[in-house]
UniProtKB/Swiss-Prot annotation:
Record key words, sorted: Membrane, Transmembrane, Transmembrane helix
Topology term for the membrane: Single-pass membrane protein
Presence of the UniProt keyword Membrane in the record: yes
Family note: To B.subtilis YfjD.
Protein known as: Uncharacterized protein YfjE
TM spans (from-to): 12-34
A GO-annotated cellular component: membrane
Pfam families in the cross-refs: DUF5381 (PF17353)
UniProt subcellular location: Membrane
Source species of the chain: Bacillus subtilis (strain 168)
Lineage of the species this protein comes from: Bacteria, Bacillati, Bacillota, Bacilli, Bacillales
Length: 152
């Protein structure tokens, strides 16, 4: 009864500390990714095509005419940005709209959706911003891939 917790070696405390840190890390990443497995993760965004098109999110929408820059990247001001890429839309009024993807959408699939349904209806500045993200060789390669093996 007088004996408390005993360790076999000096490294046991390191193992215990490492295990606790790993559990905390696992819980944090689980709670960040959990929405992807709920009804919230079923539809990430919806596109209404055409000149008056919109990108619909859960509770808001962004008109194509308001888009200044559109890209898939890491949100730099959040812990979630370390683990997951988001779709980031910079609007002409300076506001930023972030669409969480939980890494469900791959970059080529997102590029194809933008090229087919969004890019033709964006303003000239937004089109130039989209095209300037890639070298000419990269863009030709993925456009050829979309023509040969469409996923959408």
């Amino acid at each position: 009864m007088s004996e408390a917790l005993t360790f076999e070696s000096k490294y046991a405390l390191l193992y215990l500390g490492g295990g606790l840190l790993a559990m905390i890390y696992g819980l944090i990443t689980f709670f960040m990714a959990f929405p992807a497995f709920t009804s919230r993760g079923n539809v990430i965004f919806t596109i209404k095509t055409g000149p008056s098109g919109e990108i619909f999110l859960r509770k808001r929408s962004v008109l194509f005419s308001e888009v200044k820059r559109l890209y898939m990247g890491r949100h730099q001001y959040s812990l979630k940005g370390i683990f997951f890429e988001d779709i980031i839309i910079e609007k002409t009024d300076g506001k930023i709209v972030r669409i969480p993807t939980w890494n469900i959408i791959t970059n080529p699939l997102f590029f194809e959706a933008v090229e087919r349904y969004i890019l033709p209806h964006l303003n000239e500045e937004a089109q130039n911003n989209w095209i300037s993200q890639f070298t000419e060789v990269q863009r030709k390669a993925y456009l050829k891939e979309f023509e040969n093996h469409p996923k959408l």
